[in-house]
Swiss-Prot record:
Keyword terms of this UniProt record: Ribonucleoprotein, Ribosomal protein, RNA-binding, tRNA-binding
Pfam assignment, any one: Ribosomal_L35Ae
Keyword set includes Ribosomal protein: yes
One example GO MF annotation: tRNA binding
Name of this chain's protein: Large ribosomal subunit protein eL33
Originating organism: Dictyostelium discoideum (Social amoeba)
Swiss-Prot/TrEMBL GO biological process terms: cytoplasmic translation; ribosomal large subunit biogenesis; translation
The organism's place on the tree of life at top rank: Eukaryota
GO terms under cellular component: cytosolic large ribosomal subunit; extracellular matrix
Keyword Ribosomal protein: yes
The protein's role, per its UniProt record: The protein was found to bind to both initiator and elongator tRNAs and consequently was assigned to the P site or P and A site.
Similarity section: Belongs to the eukaryotic ribosomal protein eL33 family.
InterPro entries: Ribosomal_eL33, Ribosomal_eL33_sf, Transl_B-barrel_sf
Amino acid sequence: MEKIYSKGVVLGYRRSQATQYPNISLIKIEGVVSREDSTFYLGKKVCLVSKVSKSAKNPTGHKISWGKICKTHGSSGVVQARFARNLPPKAMGAPVRVMLYPSNI
């Protein structure tokens, strides 16, 4: 069976000394160790699945935040992903799914 996503971890927000950008996060993808490896993932979708309380509006109890990998960060295989909405601070260190589509092969 083909897998449709790779695992990753949110490292933190993109930031400088004075400013942090909560809608752009640094993500370390499992098995990616160089800048050349991480260029394969440019343009891929990222989803963060977080648990929320169940309600009539949300019967599953899961909230999914979608983002897109926009650029590499450094030389160790970390990438930057831009999310549609700001990620909550609780997402630091949380696992994410890096979808293997859209394909650019």
